[in-house]
Amino acid sequence: MDGEQRGRSDRPGGSPHLPFLSNPLMGDVVSDWSPLHDAAIHGCLLTLRNLISQGWPVNIITADHVSPLHEACLRGHLSCASVLLSHGAQVNGMTIDWRTPLFNACVSGSQDCVNLLLQHGATPHPETELASPIHEAAKRGYVKCIESLAAHGANIDYNISHLGTPLYVACKNQQVACAKKLLESGVSVNQGKGLDSPLHVVARMSSVELVHLLMDFGANAQAKNADGKRPVDLVPLESPLIQIFLQNEGPQSLRQLCRLRIRKCFGIRQHHKISELLLPEDLKRFLLHL
């Protein structure tokens, strides 16, 4: 409740006593879950301000190194995250499983929190492969988070051994909008997880829309994975994709080859660069896959 002074020291100017409380997100595990964490995760801004004014440290962490900022971002509470950062919260603090506030913001899908953290110096590049913000956003279908991360220099082709590229993750989770945004931004259409390409994974799932999308961006339908299988070899026999692959076995049209070559020359952030070309609108729309 707002105004409640749990754990406040009775001494004037004294530091608050930090009790051990049960973290509701950790089951029966007991951790140093503080009222500050509780206010942050529930978005109780007034309570958060009161606790900070009473002397609660904004960088107090649980046994798992979870900070109030982690919790505010996990639930997408922008105002709480802003207050914590303005009082010195560590923007790149990591939990014991390597999660940063930025990773948690991508879990919640809050572009506002992502932008706030990046503006305060959050790094879009994870220190380990275990908690990549851009992969998490791709997995959950948060296009806006991907846009913000890419705009701040995140590697949109970041290849993690156990996950693959963001495009591969988006395709595996059938996040069409994210896959399209990544392709429009200039990712490599054939980079996936090891020798398993994005086209392999969508063929395996018999996703017609994603197969069309990847082929439209030049996916190699003849590439073989570690088992020597082409994407068409992974398609269920009853799937209509069999016919689609057969229709695309021949060479690509000159028009398609020209589009792919032009887009490759522009590299990343292609939409912005192509839009500024002095070309007829119809041609620009073709280059942009619109």
Swiss-Prot record:
Transmembrane region(s): none
Gene3D superfamilies listed in its UniProt record: Ankyrin repeat-containing domain, SOCS box
SOCS box domain mapped to chain residues: 236-290
A GO molecular function held by the record: ubiquitin-like ligase-substrate adaptor activity
ANK repeat extents: 31-60, 64-93, 97-126, 129-158, 162-191, 194-223
SMART domains: ANK, SOCS_box
Signal peptide: none
Residue numbers spanned by region Disordered: 1-20
Site residues (Essential for binding to CKB), renumbered to this chain: F103
GO CC annotation: Cul5-RING ubiquitin ligase complex; mitochondrion
Keywords on record: Acetylation, ANK repeat, Mitochondrion, Repeat, Ubl conjugation pathway
Disulfide bonds: none
This protein's record includes keyword Acetylation: yes
Pfam families: Ank (PF00023), Ank_2 (PF12796), SOCS_box (PF07525)
Pathway note: Protein modification; protein ubiquitination
Listed Basic and acidic residues bias regions: 1-11
One GO BP: intracellular signal transduction
Location of N-acetylmethionine modifications: M1
Keyword hit for Protein biosynthesis: no
Compartments it resides in: Mitochondrion
Function field: Substrate-recognition component of a cullin-5-RING E3 ubiquitin-protein ligase complex (ECS complex, also named CRL5 complex), which mediates the ubiquitination and subsequent proteasomal degradation of target proteins. The ECS(ASB9) complex catalyzes ubiquitination of creatine kinases CKB and CKMT1A.
Family as reported in the entry's similarity comment: Belongs to the ankyrin SOCS box (ASB) family.
Descriptive protein name: Ankyrin repeat and SOCS box protein 9
